[in-house]
Amino acid sequence: LLLLLALKTLWAVGNRFEAQIIGGREAVPHSRPYMVSLQNTKSHMCGGVLVHQKWVLTAAHCLSEPLQQLKLVFGLHSLHDPQDPGLTFYIKQAIKHPGYNLKYENDLALLKLDGRVKPSKNVKPLALPRKPRDKPAEGSRCSTAGWGITHQRGQLAKSLQELDLRLLDTRMCNNSRFWNGVLTDSMLCLKAGAKGQAPCKGDSGGPLVCGKGKVDGILSFSSKNCTDIFKPTVATAVAPYSSWIRKVIGRWSPQPLT
């Protein structure tokens, strides 16, 4: 009975598909100054989060095109507002987690900018978890944001959308009725507050924030049907990788994290 009740509350974005926000709300402009739009020569592809003046954290699977064709745009609210074009940087170096694979395990990548971001009201880094054990607990209230599609098979959002989420028990999400054992301990399983709400195509790589002041997860994958209740959206927990992230940043940018 408990499982059936849980089924009614689940949502998702059965095959894995890059996480993409349906049923969200427009964010207050520039209320999430850490948000990044990863774009190719044509349009927005994925989200990301500024974690250092020279580094962005995103999902490794988002790097499906040559780096020369990609750019990072900061300080955006609307994707196509000529009056507010944002701040653009190109990628000098991309470092995927060495354990990343096509099962979306360890789905993280660090992108080094070709310059340094000057913190401002609209562009500001989000802190990393301090310890590897600082994963948010089951039941935690979280939120995410992105410019992903707002309807199944629809178009990208015109402005930044946000969505409230709650963390589910990963063991339940690994049940044969759900993800059937594919989730690892470093993955976070998520549900929205209402049926028909979910991150969707274009939201991969965006940050999951639980509480205040730090990035707790990076949106990773879901099903092709964004709101499939049997396939909750999955994020990569950042805390277990905090040492790796700091090591990479420290190696290539020998200065204190900001």
UniProtKB/Swiss-Prot annotation:
Please list the disulfide bridges: C46-C62, C142-C210, C173-C189, C200-C226
Per the UniProt record, the source organism is Rattus norvegicus
Q: What is the lineage of its organism?
A: Eukaryota, Metazoa, Chordata, Craniata, Vertebrata
Name the EC number(s): 3.4.21.-
Q: Which subcellular locations apply to this protein?
A: Secreted; Cytoplasmic granule
Q: What is its main location?
A: secreted
- Per its record, how is this protein called by name? Granzyme M
Q: Where is the Peptidase S1 domain?
A: 21-250
Q: Which GO terms describe its molecular function?
A: endopeptidase activity; serine-type endopeptidase activity; serine-type peptidase activity
Q: What does this protein do?
A: Cleaves peptide substrates after methionine, leucine, and norleucine. Physiological substrates include EZR, alpha-tubulins and the apoptosis inhibitor BIRC5/Survivin. Promotes caspase activation and subsequent apoptosis of target cells.
Return the annotated region ranges for Disordered: 122-141
Q: Which PANTHER family match?
A: GRANZYME M, KALLIKREIN-RELATED
